[in-house]
Structure formats: structure tokens, C-alpha cells
Amino acid sequence: MDSTGRAYDGASEFKSVLVTEGTSHYTPVEVYNILDELKTIKITSTIAEQSVVSRTPIPLSKIGLQDVKKLFDINVIKCGSSLRIVDEPQVTFIVSYAKDIYDKFMCIEHDSAYEPSLTMHRVRVIYSMLNDYCAKMISEVPYESSFVGELPVKSVTLNKLGDRNMDALAEHLLFEHDVVNAQRENRIFYQRKSAPAVPVIFGDDLEPAVRERANLYHRYSVPYHQIELALHALANDLLSIQYCHPTVVYNYLSSRAPNFLRLDDQVSLKLTSAGIGTLMPRPVVQLLDYDLVYMSPLALNNLASRLLRKISLHLVMQMVTAVQQDLGEVVSVSSNVTNPASACLVRMNVQGVQTLAVFIAQSMLNPNISYGMISGLTLDCFSNFIYGACLMLFQALIPPSALTARQRLDINNRFAYFLIKCHATQATTARLVANQVIYPVDAIDQWQSNGRDVLVAIYNNLLPGELVLTNLIQTYFRGNTAQQAAEILIPADQTSYGANETRALSAPYLFGAPINMLAPDARLSTYKRDLALPDRSPILITTVEGQNSISIENLRHKTGLIRAMYLNGFVTQPPAWIRNANSNTALLSRFLDATPNLLGIYEAILANTYANAVNVYCDSVYRADIPIEWKLHQSVDPQDLLFGVFGIVPQYQILNEAVPDFFAGGEDILILQLIRAVYDTLSNKLGRNPADIFHLEEVFKVIEEIVSVLVQQKIDVRKYFTESMRSGSFSKPRWDNFLRRPVAQRLPNLYSVIMTQADHVYNYMTQLTHIIPITDCFYIVKNSGFVDRGSTGPVIASSSVYENVLKVVHTIADFDAANALRLQRRRVDNTSYTDSLSDMFNGLRSISSSEFVRSVNGRSVFTEGRIDAIKVNMRAKFDLQFITEEGGYSKPPNVKKLMFSDFLSFLDSHKSDYRPPLLTVPITIGLNNLGETNSNTLRMRSEAIDEYFSSYVGAQILVPINVVDTRVYTEFSELRNFFTGDVVIRDDPFDVWDGVKATYIPIGVHGVRLDPNGDQPPL
């Protein structure tokens, strides 16, 4: 599309530099007739300079198998006994969850116990995991040649896999023959074999010679659990949706070129001759929801800025001095005489003509991004015949959307004032004043501050005999009747400026078409439809009479009106015509004769709109609901058109340097679509509108993190929804309006697939909650602990107990209930208080520590058989710690414990919180590794040993031992079965081409159809 992905360093990375279309000049030649003379326009354009046609939102990198993050830890112990010597201690493998990537997803370290908060946190984490894990493709497994019996095999080199070296783990086995057998079986298990199928499905219609085949891959059985490999396996899907073979890129670039261009031969040869295993970033061909740009002032402003950069007009003009000298002879200027006609000669402004032409061009490319502010629009401006004539011609060159409704109303009223002052009879004026149709001519303030269309009111109240005014107004409104002129096209409540858009405010401009029915320039419609692009086109600036001759009907219409206004006589002469009629008439006649020179502007605009016609910022639909303050404004002086009339040289070869961006310019549109898609994803996961649960600041933070991952740049949601570009303050109504708008265009498939992948990862991770150290409840007891010194099992002691020895005497429903019990205070005596929660705790039966450690056969046995407990239904996380007990007993271990007072402090710290954080409960487990020592004395029952194990006793807040998800294997084959997963890897890594530039060249001299009306899309 049009945003670069993140580049990479080193040969181990997939290159994510995107395919761009480089600088290329072409000269499509349009040949057509103007006034029976041959005319050629040459457009020199740079096709999509640095315009990106592909993107990799989640750039891939390569890792070796040894770099895969491990989800499980392995502890090896030899189980003995503190009561007797065990001649053949059982070698046991303890597999437990490691603090790793799933902790981040499950919110182990921080955040809230509030379920919606966890859900939103996990959605956010998933997208960072796409980058951190799913985008890392396992591309290398170390292997070596070995034998199984007499059969040669390729076995995985286990000694390069760190703590997953299964040969090293096998060496812990008690007997040498067991070690040898286990290591021999490792070579059988962990092998390189033929791949059953191709793991990467690109889905492109490729020639057989460049299609991926299974014999290019091998499958490796490796000492990793399939859960540990699962996230990395998703890299294959990310590869196939973001990359493709160069021939796919060639077909895409060839199809998007207009029929007068083709790809450079060297580029074509490079792309079409690419061999198997070569990849390039995949072109993005799906459509964006282009109308979203009108929902955000930032997006609209960025698009407007891009448009202004792409307008380049080259007008061929005469020397100012030559024009002034020629016109000086017409008006008979002497050195000591100044009149209105001669005074205008000093106003010849070359730069002003260029400014007007650029303003006209941007108004034609998109009517929604800017508006003009007419300077010099005084009440009596039409009395200045140069100003009035230029303003009338300017109206013929611009769509009504180029000016605000207020300015167009002011022009109508200034014209009405001129007609009443100079062309109306005294009787007509008196009658209209008496009927309150108009104000008295000398009521300047009322005329200037008037908010109604006086011209329409006059038109509607003229008598049949008042033909002069009737004809002038009818001509101005392009033949529309008074009733038609008053017709409301867009009601005030549908405009951002609260004014009715009437036909009277549109008819004087361009063709006289209503503002909501501006004609599109459809020359490239077929080309765009062939590319599945929307029929968005610039506004049509002129019609074609036939034989590709540009029509000057708009200019002829206005010159007829100007002639009637100034050259057919006045009822009351304007002051500028007194004693200057001859020179004024001479200059104005020359002016009207020269108006066809404005064809030079038509030509330049047509060339520019053609060159820019496929850009996303083009539009011919006026959107009245866009606030005025969102748009760019530009001051324009109609009198600058004076030099355009006299100085522009039409029928000349015009060099136009417009730059078509094709699909560039859609960055903000894509970001807005992603913002909406992520918001909808959060809504689906939460089951309700996120803003109903969280502050918008929290929601925006999550959206920004996710979208930033997908577009590889930091974004700020608030900046897209402000009152205007100048205010910079967030507008909640704009945001709400954005959410209310129906989704008109789904996300490009690339992003839809990535978001679907993220959803799959989310569901996959959610299914693994059983291995995560989070529990839905915990228990409060007076005392706890577990000791089994005489056991030959793997657990010899613990700071917690098994759930079956707990006797629940009270249940606390949730955090609010616990908080309420804590806040129910009562006086104990004159100096102290207690609370209901403490009373509940104090009522529990107490068990002495001696019952946990000094007991028959070294095992904890309680007098009453069970321990009184309070069950608290609050989510908690447990912090698991292993201590390997080898029988030294020299220094008591440091065992973390959580006491009832700690829980009270937790409640006091968060009593005003609506969403409490997770309570962390430590669990320490002593592993039986007593089989590592042969000392008899260490196994004697003694007070010292009892004192040592008393370190495990005393916790009052606990999570039962059986909640901890550990796997205990006494057979090495069971451990091997648990740690056996498969990865399929390409023997030769993909060759990813970096930064290929697609250069277009012209196909000779190819005529381009000028007729902007002749290729209209079907209705």
C-alpha cells in the first residue's frame, strides 16, 4: 500500500524493504483540435515516486532452534528418605512452568484482577507477541550424521540445545546401561526426516517450475513441547500473506500501468526470470475505505497537503511589459493621464495567475479540502468593471464548492446591488424598496450585513416589462427561473455551516450544475475499473464539443453576461465610466475578445487532473457536512485573472510535471480503518462497548499499541479526532460520529488475515490457562505446612497443604465482600478495635507447628484430621519456588510466607479501588534429592532436623499444592515423549529481494483520449 515496513539487519532477517515504483518519465501525447488548429499537450510525469505498492506489517526474521523460548523447566532429583537409606534412589524428572512469554499474556506480574481489564490487556499483548514470537521463523536445526544400528540417519545435535540436551539429561539415570540405551533412543527419536507436505501455502497461481515442493523441506523431531513451537509455527502464515514470488509482483505492476506505459525491460526480465525460493513483499491490491478521510481533520489535512504537493502547472505566458505596451496603445494612455482602464495595467500579476490556476486545479481535484477567500469583495465591487469582469470569468472556472456558501451569497448580493444601482429604473427600485424586497441603495450597512439572497428575491419580484434586469439575472443563473434558483439542494441541517445550499449559489459557477451533482472527469474510469479501483474522479472543468475540441461555452456564456453588464448601457453610469467610457469600452472589448486565451488554464488543468486522476485524494462529490475549519483556506484576487486573459499563450506545447501517486496517500485511511477494526475487536472480546467499561484514555492506549504494531509507526488516536487541525483538542462527538458510521469497506485482506491470526493466538493462549500460576481463589488458615521426611516421593516438604486437608468453615464471595468485612469495625475496649474479618480469622481452630513436623514416620498428621480455612473467591497469582533438599540440613531455607496481616494490609491499601490488583501468594516446595547422599547420620530423626523443616511451616494465606501444575516423570521415555515436537524447515532459505524498483517506460507515441465525458461508468 503506502507505508514502509521495518527494515532488518544481517543475513538472518527477512528483508522487509518494500517494492517501490521508481522515478520514471513518460510522455503520453494527447492530440486534439482547438478552434480548428492542431494542439499537442505533453505530460511529463514521475510515476509514483517512492510510492509503495507493497508492505509487510509484521516483518519476519529467522532464528535457530536453540533460540526458541522455553516454556518449561526441568528439575532432576534422586528421591531418597530422611528415615532410611535407599539403595537405588528413583531418578525423577520434575517438569514445571517457566516464567516466560505466557506470563505477559496472563498478566502475571501486574495489572488488575478485574476480568475485562485482563481481557483488554491480553488483546494488547497478543499483537506484541506477533512481533516477538510469531514473526520469528525457525530456520535452522543443528543436525549431524549418525547411525541407528547399520542404518545411517541425520540426528539432531542435542549438545547445542542447552538445557534441552536430552543426552545430558539421560546421564542422570542411575545405571550406565540405562544411560546408553536412552541416548541411543534419542538418536532414533530426534531425527531429520522427509517433509510430508509444504508448510507454506502461498496460494498464488504460479508456473510449476517456481512452485514450492515438499522435497525442498525436511521435518525435524526436536526436544521441545509442541506448545513451545506453536507460536513460531504461525510464521509460515505470516510469510505467505506478506510475501510472494516476483512473478506475482510483475503481473501486478504490469496490470496497473496505463496503456501508454509498460515496465522497463530489465525490471521485467529480473522479475519473470526469478527462480524457485525467491520472494518479494506482496503487493496490496485491496481497496481502502476512502471516505474515512472525511471523518478526521488530521487525515483530511494530510491528504490536502499531499494534493498541493502534486499540483504542478506550467503556463506559457507573454512578457508583462509586452502586454502592458500593447494594451497601453488600446486605451491611449499618455504620460500624464490616468483613468480606470490605464490604472489596471499596473496590476498585471504573473504570480497571481499561477496562484489562481493552482487554486482552480486543487478545487477540481477535490472539492472538500480547501476553499477560497475572495479579496476585494466590497459592496460596490461590480462598479469596477475590471474586478467585475474577472470575477465573472473566475466563476466560470471554479466549481461552487471552491468558495464558502457565505462568499457565494455575498457575490450574489454584490451583483444585486450593482444591478439596482446601475441598471434598475427609479420606479423599479422604489417598488422593490416599498415591498421590502431590497434595502434602499444608501442603506450600506443593511446591504453588507444581509444574510438572505437578495438577487433571488429581486428575480422573483420583477414585472414582465422589466426585461433588462430579468435578462441579466436569468443569464447569471444560466437560464434557471426564479423558482428554480430558490430551490434548496442541501438543507441547512445537513451542512456544517448551517446554511441552505440553493441552486442560486451553484448556478453561476462552472456549468451551472448543482453543488451536489458536480460532473466527474471520467477519462480514466475504465482504467480504474480494470484495477478494481473506485470511480473517484476529479471534477470536470470543461466539456468537449466534438473531435476532442475543448469547449469554451462557459467562457462564452460569461463574456455575454459581462458585455450586457458593462457595454449595453446603464440607467445610472458607475463613477468609473464618467468621462472614461471610450477607454473603458476599448479595454473591456479587448478583454472579452481575449478570453479564449484562458484555454491555456483549461489545458493545464486537464493535463494535471489526468495525471492525478487515480490518486485517492481525487473526488467529485461535495460533502457539506465537513466543517469549514477543517479545510485549508487561500486568499484569491479575481483581478489576477486579468493577466491570464491577456498574457497566457494557448495552443502551445505545455509541459506538465504532475506526479500520479496511484495508491499512495492512503496511510491515514488505513490507520483509521485499523483503529475501527481494533475497537470492534475489543468490543467482541469484552462483549460490550469498551467505553462503557473503561475511560477512553485506557481504550486509546490499547488501540494505539496494536495499530502501531501493524503500521510500524507510533500513532496517536486523539490527533485524528479533534475539532480542527488548529485546535488540537480531542473531540468526543467526532469520535462518536466515527463509531456510528457503518463500515463501508472491509480491511485489506492482508490486515484481516493478520487480525484473524491474532485471534487464533488469543484463543490458543486462553486454552493454556491451566499451566499459568493464577488461581480463582485462595485460603486463609491459622497455620499451615507440609512435611513428609520419610517419603521416597518427589515432594518432601511444602509451605502449603493439599486441598483435601482443608475444612472450609467460611466463604468470602469476592473482593467487595472481603472489603466490607474489613470495614465492619467494632470497639473491643477503650483503646482498640476489631473488625468482622479479623473475628472470622480469630475464630478458626489453630494447629501447632509441631503437628506439621514432629509426627509419626515423618509425615504431617493433624490431631483433628483437617485444617479450618476461610475460602476467598478472589483471583490470585502464586509465586512458585523449588528448594532441592539433599539432606545437609545445615542452614534452614528462606521460605517466603504470606500472613493474615499481609492480607489486611492489602485490603487497606486498595479499599477504595474499584478494580483490585492480583494478590501474590508464595509457594515453596522442597524436592526430595536425598538420594544424592550416602550419609546415615543425616537420615536420623533428630530435633535439629525437625527444627530445619519448621521453616516450611507458618503461612496463613495459601494456595493448595495440588493447584500447582507440575508433571513428574520417573521414566526417561515419558520425559522424551513430553518433549517431542516437529518443525518443518526449508533446506535452502528463501532469497528475499530487497528494494526492487519498478520503472515504467512509454510505449511510443500513444494517443490518450481527451474526452472527459466519453468514458462514464455505467449507472
Swiss-Prot record:
It comes from the Viruses. Keywords: Capsid protein, Host cytoplasm, Outer capsid protein, Virion. Its main location: virion. GO terms for molecular function: structural molecule activity. It is found in: Virion; Host cytoplasm. Capsid protein which self-assembles to form the inner icosahedral capsid with a T=2 symmetry, and consisting of 60 P3 dimers. This is Outer capsid protein P3. It comes from Rice dwarf virus (isolate Akita).
